[in-house]
């Protein structure tokens, strides 16, 4: 008789445990699902989460609910300081994904003998969530990059070909970042790959310190190696569809455009942003004739993604470029050739404000 009481009590405790972890898993899935729905607008991410939540709900039988006893739960209401430090959507997603995965593992272990169907479902969902979590975090990263891109008014393009001194390069870029520049593109046409990698790594670290976007010109392999925020490609570089396959969906992809046909093609192919120019004559694009302010005006009428006027732009010409319709500009010499790159950057930003 005593053995039967002990067995019944053990089953009741396991039922309580299963009830709590079903609640925990479903609640965590709902948190993730709602961010994918309202925060990311991604129905492809919402659908599996909703399906998993419904399947767990169907297996949340009344016998588990009847075993619930919140009043006697010794850990009810127990908190942890880490719970108050989740200040971003990715942090909340990571925490809730871990919560769900842990709950599902508990359901597997304790459900094998009591409820094999539930244990099997929990295992399937747990492995599915491992992969889906990565996709969701990638989508969060892309969204964050997109928001920062839309907020950027001034893009600094480096010019290490003029000066092979890494210390001076970093000094100029850091000065610009201190002034508020939030987008840096690393561009080097000369030199070797070892040199490029060293410079790109140093610039990526510097940009991360200031929470600025870091874009690599031309080189997708280099961008991936240093974990850059994206790549900028010229008209003679890879088609955007092939570039996207290599780069992945979470990073930014830019394209240089010199006429309306280029702009429309780039947008159709999924460019995240555009370079529009060269507006004026520039030493960095000697092979291209200036497109002039008329091209800026035309771009302003057709561009559906963020775009930067580029080419020979400095503090003297910005007013005319803005009057032609540009809200964002990219510069090289106006900052990198200045005796005071921080002040030059600050003045440019004030003019664009």
From Swiss-Prot:
SUPFAM superfamilies cross-referenced by the UniProt entry: Thiamin phosphate synthase
A GO cellular component entry from the record: cytoplasm
Enzyme Commission (EC) number: 2.5.1.3
UniProt region (Unknown), positions on chain: 1-128
Required co-factors: Mg(2+)
Annotated catalysed reactions: 2-[(2R,5Z)-2-carboxy-4-methylthiazol-5(2H)-ylidene]ethyl phosphate + 4-amino-2-methyl-5-(diphosphooxymethyl)pyrimidine + 2 H(+) = thiamine phosphate + CO2 + diphosphate; 2-(2-carboxy-4-methylthiazol-5-yl)ethyl phosphate + 4-amino-2-methyl-5-(diphosphooxymethyl)pyrimidine + 2 H(+) = thiamine phosphate + CO2 + diphosphate; 4-methyl-5-(2-phosphooxyethyl)-thiazole + 4-amino-2-methyl-5-(diphosphooxymethyl)pyrimidine + H(+) = thiamine phosphate + diphosphate
Protein residues bound to 4-amino-2-methyl-5-(diphosphooxymethyl)pyrimidine: 185-189, 217, 256, 285
Residues the entry annotates as binding Mg(2+): 218, 237
Class of this enzyme: transferase
GO biological process: thiamine biosynthetic process; thiamine diphosphate biosynthetic process
Keyword Transport belongs to the record: no
Entry note: cofactor: Binds 1 Mg(2+) ion per subunit.
Region of interest: Thiamine-phosphate synthase: 129-353
Keyword terms of this UniProt record: Magnesium, Metal-binding, Thiamine biosynthesis, Transferase
CDD domains: TMP_TenI
Pathway annotation: Cofactor biosynthesis; thiamine diphosphate biosynthesis; thiamine phosphate from 4-amino-2-methyl-5-diphosphomethylpyrimidine and 4-methyl-5-(2-phosphoethyl)-thiazole: step 1/1
Sites where the protein binds 2-[(2R,5Z)-2-carboxy-4-methylthiazol-5(2H)-ylidene]ethyl phosphate: 282-284, 312
GO molecular function: magnesium ion binding; thiamine-phosphate diphosphorylase activity
Record family assignment: Belongs to the thiamine-phosphate synthase family.
Family annotation (PANTHER family): THIAMINE-PHOSPHATE PYROPHOSPHORYLASE, THIAMINE-PHOSPHATE SYNTHASE
Protein purpose: Condenses 4-methyl-5-(beta-hydroxyethyl)thiazole monophosphate (THZ-P) and 2-methyl-4-amino-5-hydroxymethyl pyrimidine pyrophosphate (HMP-PP) to form thiamine monophosphate (TMP).
UniProt-recorded name of the protein: Thiamine-phosphate synthase
Gene name of the record: thiE
């Amino acid at each position: 008789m005593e053995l039967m009481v002990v067995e019944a009590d053990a089953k009741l405790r396991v039922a309580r445990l299963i009830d709590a972890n079903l609640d925990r898993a479903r609640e965590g899935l709902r948190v993730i699902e709602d961010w994918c729905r309202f925060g990311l607008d991604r129905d492809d991410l919402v659908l599996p989460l909703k399906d998993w939540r419904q399947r767990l709900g169907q297996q949340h039988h009344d016998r588990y609910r009847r075993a619930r006893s919140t009043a006697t739960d010794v850990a009810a209401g127990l908190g942890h300081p880490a719970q108050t430090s989740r200040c971003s959507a990715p942090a909340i997603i990571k925490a809730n994904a871990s919560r769900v995965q842990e709950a599902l593992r508990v359901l597997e272990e304790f459900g094998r003998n009591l409820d094999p169907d539930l244990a099997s479902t929990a295992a399937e969902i747990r492995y599915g969530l491992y992969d889906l979590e990565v996709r969701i975090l990638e989508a969060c990263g892309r969204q964050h990059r997109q928001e920062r891109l839309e907020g950027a008014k001034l893009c600094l393009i480096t010019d290490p070909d003029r000066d092979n001194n890494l210390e001076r390069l970093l000094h100029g870029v850091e000065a610009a970042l201190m002034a508020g520049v939030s987008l840096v593109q690393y561009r080097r046409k000369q030199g070797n790959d070892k040199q490029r990698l060293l410079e790109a790594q140093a610039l990526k670290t510097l940009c991360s310190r200031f929470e600025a976007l870091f874009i690599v010109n031309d080189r997708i392999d280099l961008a991936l190696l240093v974990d850059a925020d994206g790549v900028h490609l010229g008209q003679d570089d890879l088609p955007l569809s092939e570039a996207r396959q290599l780069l992945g969906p979470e990073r930014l992809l830019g394209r240089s455009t010199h006429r309306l046909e280029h702009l429309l093609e780039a947008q159709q192919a999924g460019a995240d942003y555009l370079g529009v120019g060269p507006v004026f004559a520039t030493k960095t694009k000697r092979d291209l004739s200036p497109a002039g302010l008329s091209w800026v005006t035309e771009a302003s009428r057709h561009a559906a993604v963020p775009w930067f006027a580029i080419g020979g732009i400095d503090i003297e010409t910005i007013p005319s470029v803005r009057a032609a319709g540009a809200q964002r500009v990219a510069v090289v010499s106006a900052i990198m050739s200045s005796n005071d790159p921080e002040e030059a950057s600050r003045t440019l930003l004030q003019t664009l404000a």
